Amino acid sequence: MPRPGFAHATAPALAHARARISPVARRRVVVMRTRVDGAAKSLVTQLRLALGSTASRASSIASARRRVRALGTATNDQSTGTRANPNAEGKDNSGRGIRRRFLEFYEARGHSRQPSASLVPEDPTVLLTIAGMLQFKPVFMGQREREMPRATTTQKCVRTNDIENVGVTARHHTFFEMLGNFSFGDYFKREACEWAWELATNEFGLNPERVWVSVFREDDEAFAIWRDVVGVPESRIKRMDEKDNFWAAGPTGPCGPCSELYYDFHPERGLDGADLDDDSRFIEFYNLVFMELNRDADGGIKPLKNKNIDTGMGLERMAQILQGVSNNYETDLIRPIIDKAASMAGLDYASCSATQKQQLKVIGDHTRAVTYMISDGVFASNIGRGYIVRRLLRRVVRNGRLLGIKPADGQSAFTPSIAEVAISMSEECDPQVVKNTARILAELEREELSFQKTLGRGEEMLAELIEKAKDSKSGLSGKDAFTLYDTYGFPLDITTDVASEAGIAVDLEGFEKAMAEQRSMSQAAHQTVDVTAGNALAQVADELGAMSEFIGYDNISSDVSNVLAIVSGGESVEEASGGARVDVVLDVTPFYAESGGQVGDNGFLHSADGAVLKVTDVQKAGGGRIIVHSATVVKGSIKKGSQVSANVDENARRRARNNHTATHLLQSALKKVLGDDVSQAGSLCGFDRLRFDFNCPKAVTEAQLLEVETLVNGWISQSADLTAEEMPIAAAKEKGATMMFGEKYGDVVRVVDVPGISMELCGGTHVSNTAEIGGFKIISEAGIASGIRRIEAVAGAGVVELLQQRDAVVKQLASTLRVPPEEIASRVSGMQKDLVAAQKLAESLRGELAVAKANALVSEARAVGESKVLVARLDGVDPGALKVAAENLATQLGDGAAVILGSANGDNVGLVALFDTKVQKDGDLKAGQVLGAAAKRCGGGGGGKPGFAQAGGRDATQLDAALDEALQTLTTALDK
């Protein structure tokens, strides 16, 4: 019996019909047949997935049948090639709807929907999540067992390699959503191509005659599938080179040939000479990567264990197509943010100039990016991911400033108001963004205000540099661009944007050179790693194969440990003696190797034949496989293969252990007092003290520090028991254990729990009961970088030692000041008042002396035109007194006075200028300009108003010449 919706024909009739069908019509028949086959496969999938009740199965079957019937109708309608699939009409083409339809399409085909991964990837080779496949990279590489055969996601991504094109082209972004479907050793090319075509032309209703396909030039298999199975005409299949159609997630890792789908906005231009790179005609919207290879660090490519599928569809691009707008920015994913920025600038986007639209697009795109990045715990800084946040946000601020955007009434910054729109649109992509609203808005406000403080000065300096470059007909030097970056916080791309607007080029190579020089200088003091030894240890780890066993959680000594390797002088040796410095690898050790912020143990190794080694540091090597004991041979000689007893310094371990547990309590206390947004940025648990770095946008008050300290000591006095347990990372997350943001964890983790107080992932050593810590005292709190604070503290015996040190200081002060300890504060306060009074008296006397010296100079004033000019030098006079002297001289000289005074104090130079209004008018002179030139001659700078200016310099040897030039300038201008 024939299937509903299809005609039945005998074999002869079919043969006769085929002979009369044109090649084009025959290809359309193939397309229709492919779609029906795909729908039939989908029906089978739905039948398999319908595992519920009989009613549920019946519903699934009915749904599948309806889809097949709809597909039959749709293919008949589309055979004209003149319009999109009417079956897709009336469906939700909003960004939210497209996202939902994509995910449901693949869920119906056996894919498990997975949440978006963080923008901070576990992969150390990639700074930010740039593709949907990154969270599955270990599965693709065979490093982790697959949890499911198929998956589908919507992944938030950030890429900044095309930042200069943001707002310029129709579809470049820093932040975007990547819709994807993935197969882990399950289906491969044929199914991926068929489903991609069905999704595009049936679910989304794209006209199939407007869809083009590209394949890797050597991928004949993919070409054949598109042509023979899917039915795409050869004229709309393009073979492309490796740079276009061979995809990789990063410099290393899974990769493979890919096939891309393009939408044709202008089919009337014909097939001949069509260029898929022509952005005015085509937009690439779907990329299918046939992930079957792996690229290692050396660039070698090898087959993966399984053949996998990794796809990506740009949500913004599909929204542009389905919503019928001219660019991605005008879709409902970004346009509301742009409209908010435009309204704050008093503009209507539709009537804006091209430049204004570009600026608004930058604001819309970058605001999305920083909103999601801050939500994922990335705060503005000058390094790594933090610099990307700072760079993007400062571009938002600058473009907002150019548009005239002002903060809303009662607010000090405008970026939070714009970000609120991005946050309100984020829930389906990432529900955490709304929950992190307070963190996001606070960081945006803090960073915007910080940038505003230097933006004005930086813009002035950049304007001066550009004018000089124009006058000299040269570009902006890399050194100057770096000064703007280093001193004023100007990202390089802002400098290049402003310079480009003025037609000036920037020396990018010079900038990179200056940046490299600064890095090398800052790193020089920290280069203590023995690279030779490191290479030797890595080789040892490879040769041994086995891992060192750490038994130090329960033991501080080992009676029998075998010496597996000895490294001395950067080489693996069989024996070492006579005070040699060595690195020793044991098979079993109680020594804790430095990690997680806790320092390595100290102690001794003893051999049966009398050798003694003093261990001063312990580190991991060989990717963490071996534990290396850095030691000095104190007595005898140590041999490879010998047996030793290993003994940890119990007192040092106790102190490190106390400090480590105290850091856990400290983090919990900070979260309780300052809020849950506080997160660890680093730590050091040493023998003498602890250090804890944390993300916090504001300074911590003394009252808050006292509250934190009191909380920690209260928990110590509660004598709470600690537990340490290994468990799957999923279980740890479910329990709510605190994890250090950005840290890479394995599948099994160790959870240290102080019930009701603290629960963290940690591999360090800890007390068994909080009472063992004894006490806790904060020594200092300060900011160490933008948005990062540092607390230094002591615990246990360190508290007693600190009190003893401070007691000794108090006794010494009491003795020196000859007062009891309790009266020290009042005595010091009185001395401070006396000192201030004495300083004021000294300043007054210096001023009087300067005036007296200046009075003697009145007679030296020159009459130039109708003005009275006095340029003189008064050494040893501070800036305040120099100003008083200049004002006194100007008063005595009266109308037409022009006074410039200079003073040398060691190598430093002080300058001051006062010009009467007549001088300013007659000579067209400004005090700030004249004095600025003099200061520059002295290696400094400064300026001021037309009538008054102050400046300084660092080269007193040039003061006379600078004053002579100033006098010449005045004389020339006024002698008319």
Swiss-Prot record:
In alphabetical order, the GO MF annotations are: alanine-tRNA ligase activity; aminoacyl-tRNA deacylase activity; ATP binding; tRNA binding; zinc ion binding
Q: Which family does it belong to?
A: Belongs to the class-II aminoacyl-tRNA synthetase family.
Please provide an example of a Pfam family that matches this protein in its UniProt record: tRNA_SAD
- SUPFAM superfamilies recorded: Class II aaRS and biotin synthetases, Putative anticodon-binding domain of alanyl-tRNA synthetase (AlaRS), ThrRS/AlaRS common domain, Translation proteins
EC class: ligase
Question: Which organism is this protein's natural source?
Answer: Ostreococcus tauri
Alphabetized, the UniProt keywords read:
Aminoacyl-tRNA synthetase, ATP-binding, Chloroplast, Ligase, Metal-binding, Mitochondrion, Nucleotide-binding, Plastid, Protein biosynthesis, RNA-binding, Transit peptide, tRNA-binding, Zinc
InterPro entries, A to Z: aa-tRNA-synth_II/BPL/LPL, Ala-tRNA-lgiase_IIc, Ala-tRNA-ligase_IIc_anticod-bd, Ala-tRNA-synth_IIc_core, Ala-tRNA-synth_IIc_N, Ala-tRNA_ligase, Ala_tRNA_ligase_euk/bac, Ala_tRNA_synth_plant
Q: Where in the cell is it found?
A: Plastid, Chloroplast; Mitochondrion
Q: Which reaction does it catalyse?
A: tRNA(Ala) + L-alanine + ATP = L-alanyl-tRNA(Ala) + AMP + diphosphate
Region of interest (Disordered), ranges: 71-95
The UniProt comment on domains reads:
Consists of three domains; the N-terminal catalytic domain, the editing domain and the C-terminal C-Ala domain. The editing domain removes incorrectly charged amino acids, while the C-Ala domain, along with tRNA(Ala), serves as a bridge to cooperatively bring together the editing and aminoacylation centers thus stimulating deacylation of misacylated tRNAs.
Transit peptide span?
A: 1-54
Q: Which top-level group of life is the source organism from?
A: Eukaryota
PROSITE patterns xref list: AA_TRNA_LIGASE_II_ALA
Claim: Transit peptide is one of the keywords in the record = yes
Question: What's the stated role of this polypeptide?
Answer: Catalyzes the attachment of alanine to tRNA(Ala) in a two-step reaction: alanine is first activated by ATP to form Ala-AMP and then transferred to the acceptor end of tRNA(Ala). Also edits incorrectly charged tRNA(Ala) via its editing domain.
Transmembrane domains' residue ranges: none
The note on cofactor binding and number reads:
Binds 1 zinc ion per subunit.
Q: Where is the composition biased (Polar residues)?
A: 73-85
Q: What is this protein called?
A: Probable alanine--tRNA ligase, chloroplastic/mitochondrial
Q: What are the BP-aspect GO terms?
A: alanyl-tRNA aminoacylation
